[in-house]
Amino acid sequence: MYGSTEELWFVEWEFRGTPYANRALYEQWSPLDFASKWKTPMLIVHSQNDYRVDLSEGYQAFTALRKMGVPGKFLYFPDEGHWVLRPRNRRLWWGVVLDWLDQYLRPGAVTGTR
């Protein structure tokens, strides 16, 4: 994600420098290295105009879920940024999130890999 966000300060602070100066720490916490252990269903929400987290990051996570058979859903907003702010989109966001939580958190819900 480094280099594809406008918020480099956060990444450099959390990882104590750039990936060029502290590669080991970046590799230690790379989601890609943990993806093979994912079992929890995930709802990924992304927007085209999000300059904080690049859209490709969400696609990579969703692709990993699909390849491993972990339940996942990708909700995409072509006209939003890092926050979903438009009223119509917020209603959709809330509906999808609440349906997702109901599907996986209600008593007797299916969890883990299908």
Residues of each region from the PLM?
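Active-site-proximal cap/loop segments of hydrolase catalytic domains
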Residues: 1-114
